[in-house]
Amino acid sequence: MPTLFQQIDSNTKLVQDLFGHLTPEQLNETSGAQWSIAQNIAHLILINSSYFPIIDQLQQKVYKRPFHGRFQFIVKFLGGFVKQSVEPSRQKKMKTFPVWEPKEATVLHDIIDQFTAHHQDLKRYIELAAPFIQNKTVIHSPASKVIVYELDTVFDIIIQHELRHIEQAKEQLQKILK
């Protein structure tokens, strides 16, 4: 957990350092089909938070694992596939599930503060998930019950996915500063 928390804190600091000085107009500026910096960050909050109800269900002992989550080869394959697909290098462009797309019309003024606060919530949920991580609990993706992976893989995916979108936001920043 300490390493995971360090990675989360590192991502928080990175977002604050890179984008904390920008105006709301700059944070919300888009170019073409690219998401704005604020939309990238809102997308991260949306995805990360979508796992919280599953962790709540695990805590309450009401979560039902999908049937195919019993097959380790499926769990390992899908977890590895998703993890690889969100690597920060962004060599392959990926389309997100509609449930995780940021709202286009929303102007986000305090998105950096929201992200910072969200990371505190994320760390709290990781602490709640600790016994389930140790037991190698399998969950489904909040976007699709077909996609299953171990809970510890979820947090690796979250960290990598954040770095991927921070890179995307940095590209947007370069366009803004030109």
Annotate the PLM regions.
Residues 1, 34, 104-112, 148, ...:
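Active-site oxyanion-binding pockets that recognize sulfate/phosphate
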